[in-house]
Design a protein with these regions (language model features):
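A short, surface-exposed helix-loop junction/capping segment
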Residues: 1-3, 70-79, 231-256
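Conserved N-proximal alpha/beta basic substrate-recognition cap immediately N-terminal to
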Residues: 4-113
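C-terminal active-site "lid" helix and adjoining low-complexity regulatory extension at the edge
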Residues: 6, 243-287, 291-347
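Short solvent-exposed loop/turn micro-motifs enriched in small/polar/acidic residues
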Residues: 29, 152-155, 281-285
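A short beta-strand motif that forms the metal-chelation/ATP-contact edge
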Residues: 34-46, 115-120, 159-162, 167-169, ...
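ATP-grasp fold ATP-binding core
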Residues: 85, 95, 104-106, 113-130, ...
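Active-site ExK catalytic segment of metal-dependent nucleases
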Residues: 88-91, 119-121, 130-131, 150, ...
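Phosphate-binding site of ATP-dependent enzymes
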Residues: 133-242
């Protein structure tokens, strides 16, 4: 069974095995949820990350607060930031000049682009994404908030994890669709899909239906239409939507997958790594989002301090071990006296 970033025990299993393979002792703190990796007189503390919903807004936090909904993995450093990961417009400009494919976009309030979505340069977790729309006039942008139009690309959704520019894992998701049965309206089909894994809160369901209504309108349909038996219809396109089903996700182990089909992902990682300031590059995990249209990848954004995929732990831990070995005789080595007891850590 493929490892899942949404399964806490997959995180523990993969980190534990990576530690064993590298000759580390692993201790996880019950209070802080930090992970201590220790080998001889060298040790590292991996910082936990959690996904929380605070006042309806999704955000990462390093503390296990009451609003936490998911565990998001352990990172060597949560402080790294760089412009191309903080701002989607900066990313687009950089990626285009680097030779990566990016969807056409415009920051003009009177753009004549067609088939667009509206995004905000500094948003995350799919927030502030609207559309798709046939024309820009259907949704005017606010330049003061750094909104922009982006060409809507229909295809498979990819999120790729890179460690030091090398791909570790990728998730491939299909854009959520419903299938007609000749009796149920799109509204009912969407409600059924939203409640497939667990019952959806009324407020969230209402929000999902509002979004789906816009998507359906783009395709000339409405929530009250009844699709024909077997008719398939896209009802969402945002990554992370409740309408995305884990059953439709394919996890690719990019450490061992040599399929030429994914060469574009490998080359993109090499280029994206150079978008990170040189002094921040060593020991960096980042993700990149793309749409695969059946022939090529169209790159949307990159992210620092992302939710960790368990498949990345072997490379992360191996790098820490290599760092200790290479710095063993250096004054800058990560070398500290290890206390005889660790009162805050539990085996």
């Amino acid at each position: 069974m493929a490892a899942s970033k949404n399964n806490f025990f997959d995180h523990v299993r993969w980190l534990r095995q990576a530690a064993l393979d590298a000759g580390f002792e692993l201790i996880i703190a019950g209070e802080s949820m930090q992970a201590l990796l220790r080998r001889g007189e060298y040790f590292w503390v991996l910082q936990p990350q959690f996904l929380a919903s605070v006042n309806g807004v999704a955000q990462y936090t390093s503390t296990l607060i009451d609003e936490v909904t998911h565990f998001a993995g352990w990172l060597p450093d949560r402080s790294k930031r760089w412009p191309a990961a903080n701002d989607k417009l900066i990313f687009k400009q950089w990626a285009h000049h680097a030779g990566l494919r990016v969807p056409a976009y415009s920051i003009s309030t009177d753009s004549d682009m067609t088939d667009v979505v509206v995004k905000r340069a500094a948003s995350s977790f799919g927030a502030q994404i609207q559309g798709p729309f046939r024309t820009c006039a259907q949704c005017l942008i606010d330049s003061s908030r750094r909104d922009y139009y982006e060409q809507f690309v229909d295809g498979e959704i990819f999120k790729v994890w890179y460690w030091n520019g090398a791909p570790m894992a990728a998730e491939r998701d299909t854009m959520p669709r419903v299938t007609g049965n000749g009796r149920s309206s799109f509204r009912r089909l969407i409600e059924d899909r939203a409640n497939l894994m667990q019952k959806c809160e009324p407020s969230e369901l209402s929000h999902l239906l509002e979004r789906a209504a816009v998507v359906l309108a783009y395709f000339g349909r409405s929530l009250d239409d009844v699709p024909e038996p077997g008719e398939r219809q896209i009802v969402e396109f945002r990554y992370g939507s409740t309408l995305m089903s884990p059953r439709g996700r394919l996890v690719l182990d990019m450490r061992t997958n040599v399929n030429p089909r994914w060469d574009e992902l490998r080359e993109a990682g090499r280029l994206l790594y150079t978008a990170i300031p040189e002094d921040l590059r060593p020991g960096t995990l980042f993700t990149a989002d793309a749409i695969y249209d059946g022939q090529h990848f169209w790159w949307l954004e990159m992210n620092s301090h992302p939710a960790v995929h368990p498949l990345a732990y072997p490379a992360i831990v191996a790098s820490l071990g290599a760092t200790a070995a290479s710095r063993a005789s250096s004054a800058s080595a990560v070398r500290r006296p290890v206390p005889q007891t660790q009162p805050n850590f539990l085996n």
